[in-house]
């Protein structure tokens, strides 16, 4: 066995897709060869060779190196099922035309009929043919693997280009100019994209010391490309080298590069051999908010801005160049000249935007369409402002309500600024800067920036209570409004990110300290919409959607399905209490009485559901005849007030633990008392007793959900 190398040499690949293309290319070829028995899958990974294959991807190549590939797959002995015997043989046992046709397709003739086996496959008697299937040669198997890999590449867009013959067209992500296929030091004769495989590749476009590079064997690929081609072909190795150079260059200046994994990945896909250089710009540009400058340098120029020890932007940045000239001044100077107009534009936008107040921009939002059924952004901020005022009022703080209403009115005003028009990623951030420039309070300024939070999993919540209220109002308005017009997520499609908005609402209510009932919030939110819709249907749909997200979130936090179902079955409206309820349920489940009480609770619930009698609100002591029902009534009279008092105080664990005293009387009741007594009065009274028991047991959670 020898190692295998396959490389496809192309024009510059799309940088954001490069990593996925490289991994897919290698993965498809490797697994296709495994399927064809041309590779033995390793039973154990060798510490010195931790993977049986390695992928390479640089701007102009994708490649795969595979260990221990055989020249030919072994032949296989197969007992191939042909067809039911009733179809293949006539009444006299002779072969039918259908059987002869099948045999001919497999390369056998009529003489093979006598050698057929008969077996029962569980449905009918079938005919089997013992045959030898020839194993594929490496050339055959690799051709198949390469064709499949190319067809399945995750290519964002394909282009059509003409081959050198002048009339053949090929569809691929970029024009391909070379194909390498080496098994050890032997070329594997395969073709793809109009190319014939060989052992020659190209190095760096400008800095290779040899062109072409004649590869000695499959194992020398990376080494020869680095030494003779000035290329680091491994994506990870190139990324690590860039990270090392960034840290080293920043360290010499006693600064640190901004951390951005996405930018690092993109730059890795843009260069073949990195060379990090230091550039700088005029100090005057630092008067512009650093978020603007950072975004300009990252998004447009792929530079790494440098920060000081306090995290403040400096006027220096790092350039990841694809060339290493003896005198880098021309490269650095060119990059500095290119970035200067970008920064000047940002400075101009910032200065122009500050000439108008945020409030003066609000009328402009009426020209920004939000949704054709829900109006403009101007109409939307009016609704969000009203919801924010209602939330602040519900919290009992009119000053807070007024601040939240004002912040909500201004929250979207930066959407019509020049800076946000150029860089939509800065919405909210620029609103905060402009609010501070106008002299508005930090509470309002930070609320404008933070009302988008949390934007993603793990994101921070708004920094102050005003921000919490505006963020909550914004997300409630989005969710309720879109549900009211039937724009619900379906399957994996969620174009308006409503799942993310629901998670944001949950996090603000559970972590943000806003103790407000969810149903009240939803009712108030829906009340601000003027269009016609079914209010009750929308309310129920939004509430169910939020509770579904809550259920998944709680399970992700480590609570069991039974614990979550038990608590959420009660539809608790104060979401901040849910964790306490879950901990109480967990503590209750550990009690020795828990299993019996949960089972009894389930039984009680079923009895009450099936009852065709009216259930009285109160128990009549005079109708308690059996000792067991009297004992249960007495126990309830003692336990229920204790459990209720603990529940009212928010001591959910204490409330559930108080129920433990009911185990013995509940067990005795079901052992000795017939609920469906012949006397209607006794039956009704016993149902009232069970209803009281059910109510006492199901305040914190539906304990029947814990029953096995």
Curated annotation (Swiss-Prot):
Fetch the InterPro entries from UniProt: DALR_anticod-bd, Gly-tRNA-synth_bsu, Gly-tRNA-synth_heterodimer
Q: What class of enzyme is it?
A: ligase
Q: Does the keyword tRNA-binding apply?
A: no
> What Enzyme Commission number(s) apply to this enzyme?
6.1.1.14
Gene3D superfamilies in the record: Isoleucyl-tRNA Synthetase, Domain 1
The similarity comment for this entry is: Belongs to the class-II aminoacyl-tRNA synthetase family.
What is this protein identified as?
Glycine--tRNA ligase beta subunit
Source organism per UniProt: Methylobacillus flagellatus (strain ATCC 51484 / DSM 6875 / VKM B-1610 / KT)
């Amino acid at each position: 066995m020898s190692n295998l190398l396959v490389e496809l040499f192309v024009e510059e690949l799309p940088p954001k897709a490069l990593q996925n293309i490289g991994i897919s290319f290698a993965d498809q070829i490797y697994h296709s060869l495994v399927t064809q028995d041309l590779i033995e899958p390793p039973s154990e990974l060798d510490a010195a060779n931790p993977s049986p294959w390695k992928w390479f991807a640089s701007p102009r190549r994708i490649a795969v190196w595979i260990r221990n590939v055989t020249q030919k797959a072994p032949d296989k002995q197969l007992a191939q099922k042909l067809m039911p015997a009733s179809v293949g043989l006539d009444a006299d046992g002779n072969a039918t035309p259908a059987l002869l046709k099948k045999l001919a397709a497999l390369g056998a003739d009529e003489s093979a009929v006598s050698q057929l086996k008969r077996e029962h496959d569980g449905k009918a008697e079938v005919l089997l043919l013992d045959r030898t299937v020839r194993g594929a040669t490496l050339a055959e198997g690799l051709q198949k693997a390469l064709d499949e890999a190319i067809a399945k590449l995750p290519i964002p867009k394909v282009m059509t280009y003409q081959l050198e013959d002048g009339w053949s067209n090929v569809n691929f992500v970029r024009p391909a100019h070379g194909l390498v296929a080496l098994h050890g030091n032997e070329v594997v004769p395969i073709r793809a994209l109009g190319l014939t495989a060989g052992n020659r590749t190209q190095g760096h476009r400008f800095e290779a010391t040899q062109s072409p590079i004649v590869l000695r064997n499959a194992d020398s690929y990376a080494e020869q490309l680095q030494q003779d081609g000035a290329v680091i072909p491994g994506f990870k190795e190139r990324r690590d080298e860039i990270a090392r150079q960034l840290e080293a260059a920043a360290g010499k200046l006693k600064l640190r590069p901004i951390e951005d994994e996405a930018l690092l990945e993109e730059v890795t896909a843009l260069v073949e051999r990195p060379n990090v250089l230091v550039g700088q710009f005029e100090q005057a540009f630092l008067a512009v908010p650093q978020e603007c400058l950072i975004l300009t340098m990252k998004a447009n120029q792929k530079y790494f801005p440098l920060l000081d020890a306090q995290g403040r932007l400096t006027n220096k940045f790092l350039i990841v160049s694809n060339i290493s000239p003896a005198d880098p001044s021309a490269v650095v100077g060119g990059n500095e000249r290119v970035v200067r107009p970008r920064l000047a534009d940002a400075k101009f936008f910032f200065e122009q935007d500050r000439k108008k107040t945020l409030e003066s921009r609000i009328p402009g939002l009426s020209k920004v369409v939000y949704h054709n059924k829900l109006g403009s952004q101007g109409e939307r901020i009016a609704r969000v402002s009203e919801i924010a005022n209602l939330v602040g009022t519900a919290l009992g703080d009119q000053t807070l309500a007024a601040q939240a209403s004002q912040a909500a009115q201004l929250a979207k005003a930066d959407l019509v600024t020049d800076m946000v028009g150029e860089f939509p990623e800065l919405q909210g951030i620029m609103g905060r800067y402009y609010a501070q420039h106008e002299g508005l309070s930090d509470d309002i300024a930070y609320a404008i920036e933070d009302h988008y939070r949390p934007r993603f999993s793990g994101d921070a919540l708004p920094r102050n209570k005003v921000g919490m209220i505006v963020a909550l109002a914004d997300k409630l308005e989005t969710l309720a409004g879109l549900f009211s017009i039937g724009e619900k997520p379906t399957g994996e499609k969620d174009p308006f990110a409503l799942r993310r908005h629901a998670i944001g609402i949950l996090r603000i209510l559970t972590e943000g300290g806003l103790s407000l009932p969810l149903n009240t919030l939803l009712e108030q939110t829906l009340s601000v919409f003027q269009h016609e819709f079914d209010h009750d249907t929308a309310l129920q749909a939004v509430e169910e959607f939020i509770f579904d997200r809550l259920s998944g979130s709680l399970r992700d936090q480590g609570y069991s399905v039974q614990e979550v179902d038990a608590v959420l079955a009660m539809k608790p409206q104060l979401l901040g209490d849910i964790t306490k309820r879950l901990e109480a349920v967990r503590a209750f489940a550990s009690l020795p009485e828990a299993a019996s009480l949960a089972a009894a609770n389930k039984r009680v619930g079923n009895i009450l559901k099936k009852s065709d009698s009216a259930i009285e609100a109160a128990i009549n002591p005079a109708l308690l005849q059996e000792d067991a029902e009297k004992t249960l009534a007495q126990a309830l009279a003692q336990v229920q007030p204790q459990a209720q008092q603990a529940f009212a105080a928010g001591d959910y664990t204490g409330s559930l633990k108080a129920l433990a005293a009911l185990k013995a009387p509940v067990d005795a009741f079901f052992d000795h008392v017939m609920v469906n007594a012949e006397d209607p009065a006794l039956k009704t009274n016993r149902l009232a007793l069970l209803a009281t028991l059910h109510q006492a047991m199901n305040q914190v959670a539906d304990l029947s959900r814990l029953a096995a």
